[in-house]
Amino acid sequence: MARRLELSEMKRRIPHQARARDTVETIFEAVARILRREGLDALNTNHIAETAGVSVGTLYGYFPNKQAILVAMARRELEKTEASIRAAITRSASGSEASRAAIRALIRGFGGQNSLRRDLLEAMVVNGHYAELARPAENFARLMLKAAPGQFANLSIGLTEPQAFVLTRALVGVIRAAVFENSNLMGTDALEDELVRLAQSYVRSVASRLKSIGGQNGRDLGRAPV
């Protein structure tokens, strides 16, 4: 198993100033260009620096190696996915629509047939950050309950930690498998339908169980609610 990169290894200099942020953005753009044109095997720090038009020393001032750059780029993509999920749910008129819109945003966040995003997300796994891939799905689960309080009334306190773990890893596991297997299901209504059914059926099952045992709270069934 690959060694997990520690935070101090991921980024050496925090780009607070505009010029520093521009440099980091230039590095990111260079990496994206190389991945699209030449593939992951062609990626190394010398090639990145040359493509970005910066010195290798400047690059190392921000990132210790190419894996750190890939992880930083992947985290930015995950943040965009989370924002897309929040926006999708906010725009939806009903809980059912919210679930579908959020699932669609989650699928798009994992890149579908976008090889660049696949490379970035795989870097998270290789470097020991798999749990972070589930963060957008965790936010989806929380927001879905808020968007449909009547539909999931018994879960007003939220899912317990084990319940949230099972649901989010099920969603992420299916999407990740479809992405890395280059499945023809990616981007189809059929896959979207099944993921929506998975999420809603699981949450309804949990809500029904709570009702059948007299509305016990999440702390009786598991750890703290999510």
Q: Where does each model-flagged region fall?
A:
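N-terminal intrinsically disordered/low-complexity leader segments
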Residues: 1-22, 92, 155, 207-226
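Amphipathic alpha-helical linker/stalk segments
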Residues: 11, 73-99, 118
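Pre-recognition alpha-helix immediately N-terminal to the DNA-recognition helix
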Residues: 22-34, 80, 105
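Amphipathic alpha-helical packing segments from all-alpha helical-bundle domains
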Residues: 79-85, 97-104, 108, 112-115, ...
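Short linear capping/connector segments at secondary-structure termini
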Residues: 87-88, 120-128
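Hydrophobic/aromatic-rich alpha-helical bundle segments in the mid-to-C-terminal region
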Residues: 118, 122, 150-198, 206-214
